[in-house]
Protein backbone atom coordinates (compact mmCIF):
# COMPACT_ATOMS: atom_id res chain seq x y z
CA UNK A 1 0.00 0.00 0.00
CA UNK A 2 1.29 3.48 -0.81
CA UNK A 3 1.82 6.12 1.83
CA UNK A 4 -0.15 9.31 2.37
CA UNK A 5 0.19 12.17 4.81
CA UNK A 6 -2.07 12.59 7.82
CA UNK A 7 -3.24 15.97 8.99
CA UNK A 8 -0.83 17.26 11.69
CA UNK A 9 -3.50 17.44 14.43
CA UNK A 10 -4.44 13.78 14.01
CA UNK A 11 -2.51 11.98 16.73
CA UNK A 12 -1.47 9.34 17.41
CA UNK A 13 -0.33 8.20 13.98
CA UNK A 14 -0.35 4.52 13.06
CA UNK A 15 2.21 2.65 10.96
CA UNK A 16 0.67 -0.53 9.57
CA UNK A 17 4.08 -2.17 9.23
CA UNK A 18 4.57 -2.01 13.02
CA UNK A 19 1.11 -3.24 14.00
CA UNK A 20 0.46 -6.70 15.39
CA UNK A 21 -1.71 -7.99 12.56
CA UNK A 22 -2.98 -11.01 14.50
CA UNK A 23 -4.24 -8.79 17.31
CA UNK A 24 -6.34 -6.93 14.77
CA UNK A 25 -7.60 -10.17 13.22
CA UNK A 26 -8.63 -11.49 16.63
CA UNK A 27 -10.42 -8.25 17.45
CA UNK A 28 -12.41 -8.26 14.23
CA UNK A 29 -13.07 -12.01 14.50
CA UNK A 30 -14.83 -11.33 17.78
CA UNK A 31 -17.47 -9.19 16.14
CA UNK A 32 -20.77 -11.05 16.07
CA UNK A 33 -21.89 -12.15 12.63
CA UNK A 34 -25.09 -10.72 11.17
CA UNK A 35 -27.95 -13.21 11.54
CA UNK A 36 -30.99 -13.43 9.29
CA UNK A 37 -34.10 -15.11 10.65
CA UNK A 38 -36.27 -16.91 8.10
CA UNK A 39 -39.89 -17.43 9.06
CA UNK A 40 -40.99 -20.63 7.35
CA UNK A 41 -44.43 -21.79 6.39
CA UNK A 42 -45.30 -25.38 7.30
CA UNK A 43 -44.07 -26.81 4.02
CA UNK A 44 -41.11 -28.99 3.08
CA UNK A 45 -39.28 -28.50 -0.18
CA UNK A 46 -35.93 -29.13 -1.77
CA UNK A 47 -33.66 -26.12 -1.31
CA UNK A 48 -31.21 -25.06 -3.99
CA UNK A 49 -28.61 -22.37 -4.48
CA UNK A 50 -30.48 -19.10 -4.78
CA UNK A 51 -33.27 -20.16 -2.41
CA UNK A 52 -33.83 -18.08 0.71
CA UNK A 53 -33.14 -21.11 2.95
CA UNK A 54 -29.96 -22.25 1.21
CA UNK A 55 -26.94 -21.07 3.26
CA UNK A 56 -24.92 -20.78 0.05
CA UNK A 57 -27.17 -17.93 -1.05
CA UNK A 58 -25.75 -15.56 1.58
CA UNK A 59 -22.47 -14.64 3.23
CA UNK A 60 -23.96 -14.35 6.71
CA UNK A 61 -25.63 -16.62 9.27
CA UNK A 62 -29.14 -17.96 8.64
CA UNK A 63 -31.56 -19.43 11.17
CA UNK A 64 -35.15 -20.50 10.65
CA UNK A 65 -38.35 -21.28 12.55
CA UNK A 66 -41.60 -22.75 11.25
CA UNK A 67 -45.06 -21.33 11.81
CA UNK A 68 -46.72 -24.68 12.44
CA UNK A 69 -50.05 -25.17 10.74
CA UNK A 70 -49.52 -22.31 8.30
CA UNK A 71 -49.33 -24.44 5.16
CA UNK A 72 -48.59 -23.24 1.64
CA UNK A 73 -52.27 -23.59 0.76
CA UNK A 74 -53.28 -21.36 3.68
CA UNK A 75 -50.58 -18.82 2.90
CA UNK A 76 -51.55 -18.71 -0.76
CA UNK A 77 -55.21 -18.23 0.13
CA UNK A 78 -54.53 -15.61 2.80
CA UNK A 79 -56.80 -17.48 5.18
CA UNK A 80 -57.53 -15.79 8.49
CA UNK A 81 -55.55 -17.32 11.34
CA UNK A 82 -57.45 -18.54 14.37
CA UNK A 83 -56.16 -17.96 17.91
CA UNK A 84 -53.99 -21.08 17.78
CA UNK A 85 -52.54 -20.12 14.41
CA UNK A 86 -51.60 -16.67 15.68
CA UNK A 87 -50.06 -18.14 18.81
CA UNK A 88 -47.92 -20.52 16.72
CA UNK A 89 -46.90 -17.69 14.40
CA UNK A 90 -45.85 -15.50 17.32
CA UNK A 91 -43.99 -18.43 18.88
CA UNK A 92 -41.92 -18.86 15.70
CA UNK A 93 -41.12 -15.14 15.66
CA UNK A 94 -39.98 -15.24 19.28
CA UNK A 95 -37.85 -18.30 18.58
CA UNK A 96 -36.03 -16.45 15.81
CA UNK A 97 -35.36 -13.43 18.02
CA UNK A 98 -34.26 -15.58 20.98
CA UNK A 99 -31.79 -17.32 18.67
CA UNK A 100 -30.26 -14.02 17.62
CA UNK A 101 -32.08 -12.91 14.47
CA UNK A 102 -31.20 -9.31 13.64
CA UNK A 103 -33.99 -9.14 11.08
CA UNK A 104 -36.68 -11.45 9.74
CA UNK A 105 -37.75 -12.41 6.23
CA UNK A 106 -40.18 -15.04 4.95
CA UNK A 107 -39.63 -18.15 2.85
CA UNK A 108 -42.85 -17.62 0.87
CA UNK A 109 -43.96 -14.49 -0.95
CA UNK A 110 -47.54 -14.96 0.24
CA UNK A 111 -46.40 -14.30 3.80
CA UNK A 112 -46.93 -10.67 2.83
CA UNK A 113 -50.44 -11.23 4.20
CA UNK A 114 -48.94 -11.34 7.70
CA UNK A 115 -46.33 -8.61 7.29
CA UNK A 116 -48.05 -6.36 9.83
CA UNK A 117 -48.71 -9.17 12.30
CA UNK A 118 -45.14 -10.50 12.22
CA UNK A 119 -43.70 -7.00 12.33
CA UNK A 120 -45.76 -6.15 15.41
CA UNK A 121 -44.87 -9.41 17.15
CA UNK A 122 -41.17 -8.93 16.41
CA UNK A 123 -40.90 -5.29 17.43
CA UNK A 124 -42.87 -5.81 20.62
CA UNK A 125 -40.94 -8.89 21.74
CA UNK A 126 -37.45 -7.71 20.72
CA UNK A 127 -37.94 -4.36 22.44
CA UNK A 128 -39.40 -5.70 25.67
CA UNK A 129 -37.00 -8.60 26.15
CA UNK A 130 -33.78 -7.36 24.56
CA UNK A 131 -34.21 -3.62 24.21
CA UNK A 132 -33.59 -3.66 20.48
CA UNK A 133 -35.37 -3.49 17.14
CA UNK A 134 -35.94 -6.30 14.66
CA UNK A 135 -36.88 -5.19 11.11
CA UNK A 136 -39.30 -7.41 9.21
CA UNK A 137 -39.85 -7.84 5.49
CA UNK A 138 -41.96 -10.86 4.69
CA UNK A 139 -41.89 -10.54 0.90
CA UNK A 140 -39.85 -8.99 -1.88
CA UNK A 141 -43.07 -7.17 -2.78
CA UNK A 142 -42.03 -4.54 -0.24
CA UNK A 143 -39.46 -3.47 -2.84
CA UNK A 144 -42.11 -2.78 -5.48
CA UNK A 145 -42.80 0.83 -4.53
CA UNK A 146 -39.20 2.07 -4.14
CA UNK A 147 -38.20 0.32 -7.37
CA UNK A 148 -40.71 2.44 -9.26
CA UNK A 149 -38.36 5.36 -8.69
CA UNK A 150 -35.67 3.57 -10.72
CA UNK A 151 -37.55 3.06 -13.97
CA UNK A 152 -38.06 5.65 -16.72
CA UNK A 153 -41.34 7.41 -17.41
CA UNK A 154 -43.68 5.00 -19.17
CA UNK A 155 -41.68 2.01 -17.97
CA UNK A 156 -42.87 -1.06 -16.10
CA UNK A 157 -41.62 -3.45 -13.46
CA UNK A 158 -42.36 -7.05 -14.31
CA UNK A 159 -43.41 -8.92 -11.17
CA UNK A 160 -42.72 -12.63 -11.48
CA UNK A 161 -44.91 -14.97 -9.47
CA UNK A 162 -45.72 -18.66 -9.50
CA UNK A 163 -49.44 -17.95 -9.91
CA UNK A 164 -50.72 -14.72 -11.44
CA UNK A 165 -54.27 -15.35 -10.23
CA UNK A 166 -53.19 -15.90 -6.63
CA UNK A 167 -50.98 -12.82 -6.59
CA UNK A 168 -53.72 -10.64 -8.03
CA UNK A 169 -55.92 -11.79 -5.15
CA UNK A 170 -53.40 -10.37 -2.67
CA UNK A 171 -54.41 -6.84 -3.56
CA UNK A 172 -58.01 -7.49 -2.51
CA UNK A 173 -57.39 -9.63 0.55
CA UNK A 174 -54.35 -7.96 2.13
CA UNK A 175 -56.23 -4.94 3.56
CA UNK A 176 -58.86 -7.27 5.03
CA UNK A 177 -56.24 -9.45 6.76
CA UNK A 178 -54.50 -6.39 8.18
CA UNK A 179 -57.71 -4.71 9.32
CA UNK A 180 -58.71 -7.89 11.17
CA UNK A 181 -55.37 -7.87 12.96
CA UNK A 182 -55.65 -4.19 13.87
CA UNK A 183 -59.15 -4.65 15.27
CA UNK A 184 -58.21 -7.64 17.38
CA UNK A 185 -54.99 -5.97 18.50
CA UNK A 186 -56.92 -2.88 19.51
CA UNK A 187 -54.41 -0.69 17.70
CA UNK A 188 -51.91 -1.22 20.50
CA UNK A 189 -49.07 -2.37 18.29
CA UNK A 190 -50.17 -1.59 14.73
CA UNK A 191 -49.55 1.79 13.19
CA UNK A 192 -52.63 4.00 13.19
CA UNK A 193 -52.99 4.13 9.43
CA UNK A 194 -56.02 2.70 7.61
CA UNK A 195 -54.94 -0.63 6.15
CA UNK A 196 -56.73 0.04 2.88
CA UNK A 197 -54.59 3.14 2.38
CA UNK A 198 -51.28 1.93 3.70
CA UNK A 199 -51.21 -1.86 4.15
CA UNK A 200 -48.12 -2.47 6.28
CA UNK A 201 -46.14 0.08 4.34
CA UNK A 202 -46.55 -2.00 1.19
CA UNK A 203 -48.37 -0.23 -1.58
CA UNK A 204 -49.73 -3.08 -3.66
CA UNK A 205 -51.76 -1.91 -6.61
CA UNK A 206 -51.32 -4.25 -9.53
CA UNK A 207 -53.76 -2.21 -11.58
CA UNK A 208 -51.08 0.48 -11.64
CA UNK A 209 -49.83 0.52 -15.26
CA UNK A 210 -46.26 0.66 -13.95
CA UNK A 211 -46.58 -2.96 -12.80
CA UNK A 212 -46.87 -6.00 -15.03
CA UNK A 213 -47.72 -9.19 -13.15
CA UNK A 214 -46.27 -12.20 -14.94
CA UNK A 215 -47.24 -15.70 -13.80
CA UNK A 216 -44.88 -18.61 -14.34
CA UNK A 217 -47.87 -20.92 -14.73
CA UNK A 218 -46.89 -21.64 -18.34
CA UNK A 219 -43.34 -22.77 -17.49
CA UNK A 220 -44.09 -26.49 -17.29
CA UNK A 221 -40.97 -27.78 -15.58
CA UNK A 222 -41.10 -25.04 -12.96
CA UNK A 223 -44.76 -25.75 -12.26
CA UNK A 224 -43.95 -29.45 -11.98
CA UNK A 225 -41.15 -28.68 -9.53
CA UNK A 226 -43.56 -26.73 -7.34
CA UNK A 227 -46.32 -29.35 -7.50
CA UNK A 228 -44.21 -32.49 -7.16
CA UNK A 229 -41.67 -31.58 -4.49
CA UNK A 230 -39.50 -34.27 -2.93
CA UNK A 231 -37.29 -36.51 -5.05
CA UNK A 232 -39.27 -35.90 -8.24
CA UNK A 233 -39.39 -32.13 -7.87
CA UNK A 234 -36.54 -31.24 -10.20
CA UNK A 235 -35.23 -33.23 -13.12
CA UNK A 236 -32.69 -30.65 -14.22
CA UNK A 237 -32.65 -27.07 -12.93
CA UNK A 238 -30.72 -26.03 -16.01
CA UNK A 239 -33.77 -26.85 -18.11
CA UNK A 240 -35.96 -24.76 -15.81
CA UNK A 241 -33.48 -21.88 -15.97
CA UNK A 242 -33.56 -21.89 -19.76
CA UNK A 243 -37.36 -22.13 -19.85
CA UNK A 244 -37.87 -19.26 -17.41
CA UNK A 245 -35.35 -17.04 -19.19
CA UNK A 246 -36.96 -17.77 -22.55
CA UNK A 247 -40.42 -17.09 -21.15
CA UNK A 248 -39.37 -13.76 -19.65
CA UNK A 249 -37.68 -12.81 -22.90
CA UNK A 250 -40.90 -13.60 -24.76
CA UNK A 251 -42.94 -11.49 -22.33
CA UNK A 252 -40.45 -8.69 -22.66
CA UNK A 253 -40.69 -8.71 -26.45
CA UNK A 254 -44.46 -8.24 -26.17
CA UNK A 255 -44.02 -5.63 -23.42
CA UNK A 256 -40.89 -3.64 -24.32
CA UNK A 257 -41.74 -1.09 -21.64
CA UNK A 258 -40.61 -3.56 -18.94
CA UNK A 259 -37.44 -2.01 -17.50
CA UNK A 260 -36.76 -4.37 -14.58
CA UNK A 261 -37.92 -7.60 -12.97
CA UNK A 262 -39.00 -8.24 -9.38
CA UNK A 263 -39.28 -11.91 -8.39
CA UNK A 264 -42.01 -12.46 -5.82
CA UNK A 265 -41.81 -16.25 -5.69
CA UNK A 266 -39.05 -17.39 -3.34
CA UNK A 267 -38.50 -20.61 -5.28
CA UNK A 268 -37.87 -18.67 -8.47
CA UNK A 269 -35.11 -16.60 -6.88
CA UNK A 270 -32.53 -19.20 -7.85
CA UNK A 271 -33.16 -18.39 -11.51
CA UNK A 272 -32.57 -14.64 -11.22
CA UNK A 273 -29.21 -15.04 -12.95
CA UNK A 274 -30.85 -16.67 -15.98
CA UNK A 275 -33.40 -13.87 -16.25
CA UNK A 276 -30.67 -11.23 -16.01
CA UNK A 277 -28.62 -12.85 -18.75
CA UNK A 278 -31.59 -13.77 -20.93
CA UNK A 279 -33.34 -10.39 -20.83
CA UNK A 280 -30.46 -8.03 -20.13
CA UNK A 281 -32.51 -6.31 -17.42
CA UNK A 282 -31.82 -5.83 -13.71
CA UNK A 283 -33.53 -8.33 -11.41
CA UNK A 284 -34.48 -8.04 -7.76
CA UNK A 285 -35.59 -11.07 -5.75
CA UNK A 286 -35.97 -12.48 -2.22
CA UNK A 287 -32.19 -12.84 -1.96
CA UNK A 288 -31.84 -9.14 -2.73
CA UNK A 289 -34.23 -8.46 0.14
CA UNK A 290 -32.15 -10.43 2.64
CA UNK A 291 -28.92 -8.79 1.55
CA UNK A 292 -30.50 -5.34 1.69
CA UNK A 293 -31.62 -5.83 5.29
CA UNK A 294 -28.25 -7.28 6.30
CA UNK A 295 -26.47 -4.09 5.23
CA UNK A 296 -28.14 -2.23 8.07
CA UNK A 297 -26.26 -4.47 10.51
CA UNK A 298 -22.95 -4.75 8.70
CA UNK A 299 -20.12 -2.70 10.16
CA UNK A 300 -17.70 -2.19 7.30
CA UNK A 301 -14.99 -1.43 9.83
CA UNK A 302 -11.85 -1.68 7.64
CA UNK A 303 -13.21 0.83 5.12
CA UNK A 304 -14.38 3.16 7.87
CA UNK A 305 -10.98 2.97 9.50
CA UNK A 306 -9.20 3.97 6.33
CA UNK A 307 -11.54 6.72 5.22
CA UNK A 308 -12.36 8.57 8.43
CA UNK A 309 -10.17 10.78 10.56
CA UNK A 310 -9.75 10.62 14.31
CA UNK A 311 -13.13 10.05 16.01
CA UNK A 312 -14.66 10.02 12.52
CA UNK A 313 -14.78 13.81 12.43
CA UNK A 314 -12.43 14.63 9.58
CA UNK A 315 -12.59 12.57 6.40
CA UNK A 316 -9.59 12.44 4.12
CA UNK A 317 -9.40 15.16 1.49
CA UNK A 318 -11.01 13.53 -1.59
CA UNK A 319 -8.90 15.69 -3.88
CA UNK A 320 -5.76 14.05 -2.54
CA UNK A 321 -6.93 10.50 -3.04
CA UNK A 322 -7.98 8.21 -5.85
CA UNK A 323 -11.70 8.16 -6.62
CA UNK A 324 -12.36 10.06 -3.40
CA UNK A 325 -12.38 6.80 -1.47
CA UNK A 326 -9.62 7.62 0.99
CA UNK A 327 -7.08 5.45 -0.84
CA UNK A 328 -3.52 6.70 -0.95
CA UNK A 329 -2.29 7.87 -4.32
CA UNK A 330 1.23 6.70 -3.59
CA UNK A 331 2.60 10.15 -4.31
CA UNK A 332 2.57 11.56 -0.79
CA UNK A 333 5.49 10.69 1.52
CA UNK A 334 4.89 10.16 5.20
CA UNK A 335 2.49 8.03 7.15
CA UNK A 336 -0.92 6.48 6.73
CA UNK A 337 -3.90 8.53 7.90
CA UNK A 338 -4.46 8.33 11.64
CA UNK A 339 -7.21 6.00 12.75
CA UNK A 340 -10.00 6.96 15.12
CA UNK A 341 -9.46 6.29 18.81
CA UNK A 342 -11.75 3.26 18.80
CA UNK A 343 -9.77 1.57 16.03
CA UNK A 344 -6.48 2.54 17.67
CA UNK A 345 -7.69 0.70 20.76
CA UNK A 346 -8.51 -2.37 18.69
CA UNK A 347 -5.01 -2.44 17.25
CA UNK A 348 -3.40 -1.97 20.66
CA UNK A 349 -5.53 -4.75 22.13
CA UNK A 350 -7.11 -2.51 24.74
CA UNK A 351 -10.68 -2.77 23.40
Curated annotation (Swiss-Prot):
EC identifiers of the protein: 4.4.1.3
Entry keyword set: Lyase
Keyword presence, Lyase: yes
Highest taxon of source: Eukaryota
UniProt-listed GO biological process terms: protein homotetramerization
Name of the top EC class for this enzyme: lyase
Catalytically driven reaction(s): S,S-dimethyl-beta-propiothetin = acrylate + dimethyl sulfide + H(+)
Family of the protein in this entry: Belongs to the aspartate/glutamate racemases family. ALMA1 subfamily.
Its job: Mediates cleavage of dimethylsulfoniopropionate (DMSP) into dimethyl sulfide (DMS) and acrylate. DMS is the principal form by which sulfur is transported from oceans to the atmosphere and is a key component of the ocean sulfur cycle. Constitutes by far the most highly expressed Alma gene in CCMP373 strain.
Protein name as catalogued: Dimethylsulfoniopropionate lyase 1
Phylogenetic placement of the source organism: Eukaryota, Haptista, Haptophyta, Prymnesiophyceae, Isochrysidales
